[in-house]
C-alpha cells in the first residue's frame, strides 16, 4: 500500500468500486489518494512506489486524474532516463559497450515517457504541462 495509515480506507474504496465502478465520489477519492501518494513517493525518491501509485489511477473513469497520472508517469520515466544517461556519461569514452547498454536502458525509459505523454495528450489535448513536456521527450530521443 502506498500510504500505510490509510489501508482500510483504500480497501473500502476498492470494494466499493468493484460494486459501483462509476460512483463519482469513490472514483474521485481513490484517484486523489493515489495521485497524492504517488507525488509523495516521488518527492521521497521512491520512484517505483510512485510509479505503482500512478498506475492505479489510469483505469479510472476520470479524465483529469487519468491525465495527471499519465503526465506524472511520463515525467517519472523521463527523469529516470535522464539519470541513467547522466550516470553513464563517464563511460562514453572508457567503456563503449557498457555505455551503449546504459543508453539503451535510458532510451527505453524515454520511449515509455513518450507513450504516457502521448496517451495523456489524446485524453486532454489542452493540458499545458503535457504540451510542454512532449517536445522535451521527443528532442532527447533524436
State where each predicted segment sits.
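Conserved small/polar residues in nucleotide/adenosyl-binding loops
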Residues: 1-6
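Structural marker of alpha-solenoid helical repeat scaffolds
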Residues: 19, 60-62, 123
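Short coil/turn linking the two alpha-helices of tandem helical-hairpin repeats
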Residues: 24, 31, 38-45, 74, ...
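TPR alpha-solenoid repeat register
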Residues: 26, 33, 67-69, 98, ...
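Short coil/linker segments at helix-helix boundaries
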Residues: 79-116
Amino acid at each position: 500500500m502506498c500510504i500505510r495509515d490509510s489501508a482500510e480506507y483504500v480497501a473500502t474504496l476498492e470494494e466499493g468500486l468493484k460494486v459501483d465502478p462509476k460512483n463519482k465520489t469513490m472514483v474521485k477519492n481513490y484517484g486523489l489518494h493515489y495521485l497524492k501518494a504517488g507525488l509523495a513517493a516521488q518527492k521521497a525518491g521512491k520512484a517505483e512506489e510512485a510509479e505503482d501509485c500512478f498506475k492505479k489511477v489510469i483505469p479510472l473513469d476520470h479524465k483529469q486524474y487519468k491525465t495527471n497520472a499519465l503526465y506524472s508517469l511520463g515525467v517519472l520515466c523521463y527523469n529516470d532516463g535522464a539519470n541513467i544517461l547522466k550516470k553513464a556519461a563517464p563511460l562514453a569514452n572508457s567503456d563503449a559497450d557498457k555505455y551503449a547498454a546504459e543508453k539503451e536502458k535510458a532510451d527505453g525509459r524515454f520511449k515509455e515517457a513518450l507513450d504516457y505523454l502521448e496517451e495523456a495528450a489524446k485524453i486532454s489535448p489542452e493540458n499545458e504541462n503535457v504540451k510542454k513536456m512532449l517536445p522535451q521527450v521527443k528532442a532527447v530521443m533524436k
